[in-house]
Amino acid sequence: MPKRDDIKTILVIGSGPIVIGQAAEFDYAGTQACLSLKEEGYRVVLVNSNPATIMTDAEMADKVYIEPITLDFVSRIIRKERPDAILPTLGGQTGLNMAMELSAAGILDECNVEVLGTDLTAIKKAEDREAFRDLMNELGEPVPESDIIHNLDEAYTFVERIGYPVIVRPAYTLGGSGGGICHNEQELIETVTSGLKLSPVTQCLLEKSIAGFKEVEYEVMRDANNNAMVVCNMENIDPVGIHTGDSIVVAPSQTLSDREYQLLRDVSLKIIRALEIEGGCNVQLALDPDSYNYYVIEVNPRVSRSSALASKATGYPIAKLAAKIAVGLTLDEVRNPVTGTTYAHFEPTLDYVVAKIPRFAFDKFEQADRRLGTQMKATGEVMAIGRSWEEALLKAVRSLEIGADHLLLEEAENADAETLERKICFPEDDRLFFLAAALRRGQTIEQLHAKTKIDLFFLYKLSKTIELENRLKENPQNEEILAEAKRAGFSDAFIATCWNIDEQAIYDLRKAQNLFPVYKMVDTCAAEFESTTPYFYSTYEDENESIRSSKESVIVLGSGPIRIGQGVEFDYATVHSVWAIQQAGYEAIIINNNPETVSTDFSISDKLYFEPLTLEDVMHVIEIEQPLGVVVQFGGQTAINLADGLAKRGVKILGTSLEDTDRAENRDAFEKALEILQIPQPAGKTATSVEAAIKVATDIGYPVLVRPSYVLGGRAMEIVESEEALKHYMTNAVKVNPKHPVLVDRYVSGQEVEVDAISDGENVLIPGIMEHIERAGVHSGDSIAVYPAQRLSEQVKNTIVDYTTRLATGLNIIGMLNIQYVVDGEEVFVIEVNPRSSRTAPFLSKITEIPMANVATRVILGENLIDLGYTPGLAPEKQEIFVKVPVFSFAKLRSVDTSLGPEMKSTGEVMGKDVTLEKALYKGFVASGTTMHDYGTVLLTVADRDKEEAVELAKRFNRIGFTIMATKGTASTLEEAEIPVSQVKKIGENQETLIDYIRNGQVTLVVNTLTTGKRPERDGFQIRRESVENGIPVCTSLDTAEAILRVLESRSFELESMNASEVKQPKARV
């Protein structure tokens, strides 16, 4: 069936900011789709609010709109661009929900726009819990006994009939938002209330819990001719009850018999055909381990996180082909880009095993509830490929970057019996390590199976790994056992620990017996057909399939799994660096392990190695490829941390030298450099003990900013106001010693400014200066950034340009650098210099049209800025105003304090642009999910230090018609200033308290700067959490509140009566 020629323009809806449940996989899918549609000759219009994505690059579509994905803005784009069709199935839950909203509002009919891929009826049947259940009943496919509920009373009725436990699944939500397993009435009340609030149609499915069944997923494709095929089947190691995004997953499934596999395959194909989906679809099934009984859990009628994993696991580009199917092409017409000879309807065959392990942010959120359930909590994931499950699993473990290079975690090994039991029976993010610890202590696989319902096959494989550990320890330097351990995925570092020698000695032993990995190709067909994909994984076998080319090559290290502090921004820079290397005439090679990202799409680089980012794994690739050098600037802290080990092994680090990187990152060396350059910084010193830290703080005066050296995302950073708080920080937050010093600085509460620059060693280009709306003390990644800076004098700007130029040349930076300053009056202090790409680089690249990672890479390869056509100094500022607004995932992470400080908490970002700051901010807030009410009630409860400032804010809120509510202390201050205020009771007082007002929806905005404590029992913590749980915007910085207020003021009108007697009264605005 030829592609459709009755449509010319297609609107692709992106997925918006990165949040838990919807990460970089949709940048990968959207990028593939846009390129695929352009390849077929269609005019592509894209809307997405996330500037940190490749898909929002100008080259990806004919028209790119970085605008809020809301009904209002998408409708405007449709009316302006007049597309013939929209493709919403590549924008995750955001894209699907937007399509449903556009349809319900009549926009699609009004503008005569067709929905491609999956029609709205199919979306409704899959997403609406009631319609889905009805369809399964029609097909005769079993679903767990369930009921659709719209309120708590209906939930009670269902539980009375079925009994506990029950699973709550809200309709039209992402990553299981608001859902969970309920074992008692208290859990039922909490989960159902939260689920109904988060569901856009106020609907939840309550179903009988089938926790303990095997969870299996099928990734399927179908075209308009009703051809359907399975791309990949995947098995969750964790049984039903844990969200698939939080589960360890293996592909292909390992424990299904052929009969079970075919049974579930047939069901999946039957469902995609019944829904008449044209494109990709994910079917989740539950299989009774003791019979052939199964249940259909749910269907995602779109490209998903699992599609990205299936694409990378098989090499089969699902999103690219789904876009082609959406425009009428069929599976038997489209060639498989991997083989170039077979067609897309051939089902991929794997002759290897793939392991996926989720990456969580609990290192950032120590207070978070780590218990896993049906609501997703992981921020990212890693994937590894091996010839056996054991090998793939161990490679995935060391890809996680959690300080473990094996199934060995200190906390698990040192845990008492009670903790060990709890961690095994009630799964948390680190259960895998506790299972290994239990096996080391002699628990049997049968005992562990009874407690966890994890299949005996996986537990047996774990026990074999532990057995091999013991044999290693008993036979030091035994060549046969060394070879066996390497085949099973053991790292040199772990073997060295077993044998009590250093890692280099293991490498030397392997070298002596020529024990090195070979690289195998991912080809979708188990080598049945000729394939030319440059996509490889390592394993300890005989035949090597990766042949070094005659062309000079450069290796770029990726940034690994997405986590808070190191997000998709670094993948963006990695991809641009690869493109620049190719433009400069070299072969570009990527090493990375994140299945969600664009960088691990094999068509991006000349060669892709899907490997852990450890010294050992990276060195093996370097030894086989013999590159000109390695680029570490774009892979975040992951890549920077490898530079030292690589250099010691004789590898050339391209760009800024290791010594100069250390001068920027090592506190004492940095201070010396600043002294020579005569650039001021806030007073401070390095401390290597608790006593030293107290002395430094006493000398410079409180408050002080404390943080460990060499961190990303403000890990363990805090503003400390007293000696007692400092002692608590030093003993709880960090392990201070001479090897890991702590920096203690005077805290300057000024205006924070951020600069990204590129240096070729002589010339320095500054694309832009960004100012932060929140004052210093809030992590730059959590601040609203504004470009061009609005509040800086010309003198301050000139100083910043001067300091940036001097720092770049003085530190011998070659490539990119990011500098953070604090401005106090007309004084400028440098806070820190990062000699690498930053999380603001994609934002600044988009708005200044200077492709920073591309230019920096050309400079790293030896070109200079002037020859590349750039004038040194600050680039001319744009007329429009751009803002970068952070996006948080607090709703997914219960028990986490939402207050902002020096440690980063946001998972993603959006951009707003317009002709005024207020309009740009409005777009940014709306795109980030902040509800902007033009009137309502503001709850103010602020610390004493903020009361004076709060009075001014309250006056302005009152003037535009908002009601002010405040707790006793704040209310008294406002009354003294003659501002109308309703006093509300604090938590714990009798009668209705402020928490009741928040829960009852009587508050539209909360401004809370009350307590800095992290303990959940603190009032401020409870106020902030309740606000998040109830979808109410909460500002923990008066600067953010002022920004929202500016927007609201700009949207209000003057209202003044004509009575002469009232003319002298202050003007009211609404």
UniProtKB/Swiss-Prot annotation:
InterPro entries: ATP-grasp, ATP_grasp_subdomain_1, CarbamoylP_synth_lsu, CarbamoylP_synth_lsu_oligo, CarbamoylP_synth_lsu_oligo_sf, CbamoylP_synth_lsu-like_ATP-bd, CbamoylP_synth_lsu_CPSase_dom, MGS-like_dom. Residues 930-1070 are annotated as: Allosteric domain. Residues 930-1070 form the MGS-like domain. It holds the Pfam family MGS. ATP 1 binds at R129, R169, G175, G176, K208, I210, E215, G241, I242, H243, Q284, E298. Mn(2+) 3 binds at Q820, E832. Its EC number is 6.3.4.16, 6.3.5.5. It comes from the Bacteria. Residues 402-546 are annotated as: Oligomerization domain. Residues 547-929 are annotated as: Carbamoyl phosphate synthetic domain. GO terms for cellular component: cytoplasm. Pathway: Amino-acid biosynthesis; L-arginine biosynthesis; carbamoyl phosphate from bicarbonate: step 1/1; Pyrimidine metabolism; UMP biosynthesis via de novo pathway; (S)-dihydroorotate from bicarbonate: step 1/3. Residues 1-401 are annotated as: Carboxyphosphate synthetic domain. Residues 133-327, 671-861 form the ATP-grasp domain. Mg(2+) 2 binds at E298, N300. Binds 4 Mg(2+) or Mn(2+) ions per subunit. Large subunit of the glutamine-dependent carbamoyl phosphate synthetase (CPSase). CPSase catalyzes the formation of carbamoyl phosphate from the ammonia moiety of glutamine, carbonate, and phosphate donated by ATP, constituting the first step of 2 biosynthetic pathways, one leading to arginine and/or urea and the other to pyrimidine nucleotides. The large subunit is composed of 2 ATP-grasp domains that are involved in binding the 2 ATP molecules needed for carbamoyl phosphate synthesis. The N-terminal ATP-grasp domain (referred to as the carboxyphosphate synthetic component) catalyzes the ATP-dependent phosphorylation of hydrogencarbonate to carboxyphosphate and the subsequent nucleophilic attack by ammonia to form a carbamate intermediate. This is Carbamoyl phosphate synthase large chain. It comes from Listeria innocua serovar 6a (strain ATCC BAA-680 / CLIP 11262). The lineage of its organism: Bacteria, Bacillati, Bacillota, Bacilli, Bacillales. The gene is carB.
